């Protein structure tokens, strides 16, 4: 196995690796730390997962909080009841849920099929768009718990859509950079049929949250940038 580390934005790194003939790309942010056996475990698991699910896949390491290694750095998707405890997750060989671009193994054949990362979406959305594109093209997304990647804890926070009622929550990003998130979500929800069916629910949750928390400036920002993303205005 020949390994190279290439800096710069992920879209530039991946283009360099692809153009130089590499068979495998491992995507990760510069604030993540791979376990010493991460890449080995991902590559060794690839054919096993493909054989089990019967289609091409993108594999991901299990992303642990680097300051509390007993738990994942990120929560799972909305509605998921999957645990965040590492030892429980490691009881499975692989599962259909990932935290992408944190130890993400992509085979060259997948890139040939779905293309490169949309560079304009860098930060809080490029990874989500690429995974949505993969799903749209019939590619499976799986975490391999034997492969571990360490990352700082999620910067967003969960907020109650209606104050004091914790049953319904959304991910709340820091206001200083939230426009990137809104714009990229607009593009993803409006582009892929698998996501479009959930767009009304997502927008309603954002609107209600900002109204009930008196965040009217943030609400205006959400409407502006979500619409820009819907129309691919970058």
Question: Which residues does each PLM region occupy?
Answer:
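Active-site nucleotide-sugar/metal-binding loop of Leloir-type enzymes
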Residues: 12-24
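Short beta-strand-to-loop element that shapes/binds the nucleotide-sugar donor at the catalytic cleft/hinge
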Residues: 59-71
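Acidic donor-binding/catalytic loop of UDP-sugar-dependent glycosyltransferases
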Residues: 32-45
